Regions:
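Extracellular ligand-binding interfaces
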Residues: 62-97
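Extracellular carbohydrate recognition
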Residues: 103, 127-144
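Extracellular beta-rich ligand/substrate-recognition surface
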Residues: 33-43, 98-101
Length: 145
């Protein structure tokens, strides 16, 4: 995640901009020059036009900061009437989270097939944990497979 608009990666939407930040320190970036650091309670999303009949892969690298950081990645399909369906989830629990910089864990999930009536696909990422916990995400990708 290289380009930011204030604290939020460019092209992404946040539930609260104050819960996001650009991470650039040693051990905080998987590749490139920066990553996004999400505080507990942060919800970040990005919506794309759907390709009906296809599958989508959501992948990302994550590193936890604090005692109980966790993250959930989700692929959501939305149809022309505005109805949403959860197409895939990947949850990284605190006990499974890599918490030792400069190491990152790699996580991915593949969606169900996109139905013909689906018009958009949304990537949704949510950081959870204690008040002082956060998750650093890098190389977030949604690809047609």
């Amino acid at each position: 995640m290289e380009q930011f608009t204030n604290t939020v990666p460019t092209g992404w939407t946040m539930n609260n901009d104050a819960l996001a930040g650009q991470a650039t320190g040693a051990g905080q970036v998987h590749s490139g020059l920066s990553a996004v650091q999400l505080a507990s309670g942060a919800q970040m999303s990005q919506t794309h036009a759907a390709a009906p009949g296809s599958y989508y892969r959501l992948s990302f690298y994550a590193q936890g900061v604090g005692d109980q950081p966790a993250v959930t990645g989700r692929i959501i399909f939305t149809d022309a009437a505005g109805g949403e369906s959860n197409a895939a989830d990947v949850t990284v629990r605190s006990q499974d989270m890599v918490k030792t910089a400069p190491n990152f864990g790699y996580y991915q999930v593949i969606s169900t097939v996109v139905p013909e009536n689906v018009t958009t696909v949304t990537v949704y990422l949510e950081a959870t944990g204690g008040a002082d916990d956060s998750v650093i995400l890098d190389d977030v990708s949604l690809t047609v497979v």
